Each structure stands twice: as structure tokens, then as C-alpha cells.
């Protein structure tokens, strides 16, 4: 998914201009702008600032959007690795039609603690906040009471 490219494409469309005109006005090739809009290239800081200036956007908005997208993609990829490992360990034998999308974060964390090794467990801290992991650990894993 390329949200930043789609957003820039929408800005261009809503401005009533063509990609070639916008590219010319900000001093880049039409091909480079097209690569950014289609997600084939990332924005450089310099180019993000030029596009933000052209469309009167706050400084850093596009670059921040791109960074957030990169972080989300990274987290999704890490979660996919853990989910695949959990399936290989048959952690979901009692679940019906389980998928990465319909598994709660709490169940995901709990099963990771139960079925996977320390290297895999450490990946949880790249996906979720420490306090949330600790809460799930206390509520679902640690034996309470007698």
C-alpha cells in the first residue's frame, strides 16, 4: 500500500494540474514524480519540502506520513513472521478460521509467549508497547492467587 503516493496524486488531481506541470513547477522530472505517486520511489526530505511548499502544506507533513507508513509496514511484516511461526507450531489448533486479521492482540501476545522462543518473543516489543505486553502477561500468563 502506498498512502503517501496516493495522497500526493490526490493533491495533484484536486489542484487541477497534471503531473507534468507540477513536476516542472517544483523542478523535478515527470518520471520521478510519477515514481513517487505510484510508490516506486520514496520521498527525499528535499522533495517532500518542495511538494509541501507547492501545495501549501505544513513543513514535514509528507515526510512524517511516509515515516509512519514505513513503521506500519515494518510492524505488519514482523507480525506476519510471528503469525507464520505460531501456525507452524500449531498454536491455533482450537481456533476456527484464524487469520492475522481476526486474532486479537491479546491472543496474539499470549500465544507468542506460550509457543515461541525468546528471539520471537522479543519481536513483540517491536510491534506493541511494553506496558501493553506486560498487561497481557499479567492477565493471561502469570498464575494469580492460589
Regions found by a protein language model. Name each.
Residues 89, 101-146:
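Mid-protein regulatory/catalytic core that forms ligand/cofactor-binding pockets
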Residues 46-61:
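DNA major-groove recognition helix of helix-turn-helix/homeodomain DNA-binding modules
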Residues 19-24, 33, 51:
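Short alpha-helical "recognition helix" segments of helix-turn-helix
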Residues 16-18, 46:
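Residue-level signal for the short linker/turn that defines the boundary of a DNA-recognition helix
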Residues 1-16:
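A short, Lys/Arg-rich alpha-helix, primarily the initiator
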Residues 63-92:
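Short, charged recognition helix plus adjacent turn
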Residues 28-43:
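Recognition helix of helix-turn-helix/homeodomain-like DNA-binding domains
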Amino acid at each position: 500500500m502506498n498512502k503517501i503516493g496516493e495522497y500526493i496524486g490526490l493533491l495533484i488531481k484536486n489542484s487541477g494540474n497534471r503531473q507534468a506541470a507540477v513536476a516542472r513547477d517544483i523542478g523535478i522530472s515527470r518520471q520521478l514524480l510519477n515514481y513517487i505517486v505510484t510508490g516506486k520511489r520514496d520521498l527525499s526530505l528535499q522533495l517532500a519540502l518542495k511538494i509541501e511548499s507547492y501545495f501549501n502544506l505544513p513543513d514535514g507533513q509528507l515526510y512524517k506520513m511516509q515515516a509512519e507508513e514505513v513503521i506500519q509496514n515494518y510492524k505488519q511484516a514482523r507480525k506476519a513472521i510471528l503469525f507464520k511461526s505460531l501456525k507452524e507450531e500449531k498454536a491455533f489448533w482450537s481456533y476456527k478460521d484464524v487469520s492475522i486479521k481476526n486474532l486479537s492482540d491479546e491472543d496474539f501476545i499470549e500465544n507468542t509467549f506460550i509457543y515461541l522462543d525468546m528471539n520471537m518473543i522479543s519481536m513483540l516489543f517491536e510491534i506493541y508497547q511494553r506496558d501493553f505486553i506486560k498487561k497481557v502477561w499479567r492477565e493471561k500468563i502469570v498464575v494469580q492467587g492460589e
